[in-house]
Amino acid sequence: IDNVLSRKSSWFVSYPINSYNVTLYIGDYIHFSDVLVRENDTLSLDYYVLSYNKEKAQNHFNQVKPMLECFEKYFGPYPFLNDGYALIESSYLGMEHQSAIAYGNNYLPGYNGNTNYTADLDFDFIIVHETGHEWWGNSITSNDIADMWVHEGFCTYSEVLYVECMYGYQKMLEYVNNQKNRVRNDKAVICDFHVNCKGSSDMYSKGSLMLNTLRNVINNDSLWFAGIKGLATQKKHSTLDGVEVINYFNRFFNLDLSKIFEQYLSHKDIPEFEYKFQKKGRSYSLIYRWNAINDFDMPLIFNVGINEKRIFPSSDWQELSLGSFDKKDFVIRDDLLFINIKKT
């Protein structure tokens, strides 16, 4: 090769890395950089974009630093400090290549301009989702593709927490409930182990909605966020099985959440809350049960007016006296729980 026309570049990765996270980019790139100053150190931010997109990229990538600050709030420090954070313009939409994220969202909001993915919020979906993978998928990696929900469920949930951090709690609720539109319930999320089997693509949105459901089951946000950050920091730079994640949750929250994980991950259907009203004089009783797997154990949240209540259905019919009230004031909080509702 004519040395005048060739150039050799050497790159070093100082952390464990999955084989699929290694990539090669070749293009007419220009480089610009920034830093994220933190309490005890500085994270380098490097951007490689096609030369004619420099000005556009410099403006568009302003969203990176506040996003990283949100993720560090919930998941702990960026897990690849020594290698830095980078976005590299690519010919495809995106991929979570470790410390060298492929970016091809055309400097548009949403998913290549489609803000249905972002519940009409104007952030860049690819930047946020692929960056979430630095914690979920790159730092913490499943041992088997059958447990890929650990990557995609937690990463898709990272979008939800980003929205809460940047836009507030109510926008977060709108965002996470918008994810229901992408759930098909076609087959189980967890697939057969040791045979290179990947489960339903529902692992993305259903995984996120399951985690939001668990947050409301726990019903203690400071404890919930401590548990999420603890998982991200204690298991960083390691591989694990999905059952280890479930066991961690059970220990940390001192609850047996196994049946909730089983319902959402090992079966295609989500739990169904079945109910009816029975009138006795001027009073009403609520007759209710779960249609779910055996021994399914999860509270049901509902409001009567401004009062929030929790009940613990089983597969058997149960009865709760509600007294005299207007049935229009009865609201099942399926914005907090990912469930189906059947009124009989």
Language-model regions, residue ranges each:
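Hydrophobic helix-coil surface modules that form long, contiguous segments used
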Residues: I1-V128
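Intrinsically disordered, low-complexity linkers and stems that provide flexible hinges
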Residues: I1-Y29, S33, E308-T344
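Active-site-adjacent bridging/hinge elements
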Residues: E39-S44, V128-E134, N177-D192
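Zinc-dependent metallopeptidase catalytic helix centered on the HExxH motif
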Residues: K65, C70, G104, P109-L173, ...
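Amphipathic alpha-helical substructures
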Residues: P79, S200-G281, L286
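Active-site-adjacent structural elements in folded domains
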Residues: I88, Y117-D122, I190-G199, N212, ...
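Acidic/His/Gly-enriched intrinsically disordered linker/tail segments
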Residues: M148, E152-M210, K235
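Beta-strand-rich binding/interaction modules
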Residues: L257-S258, F273, F277-D335
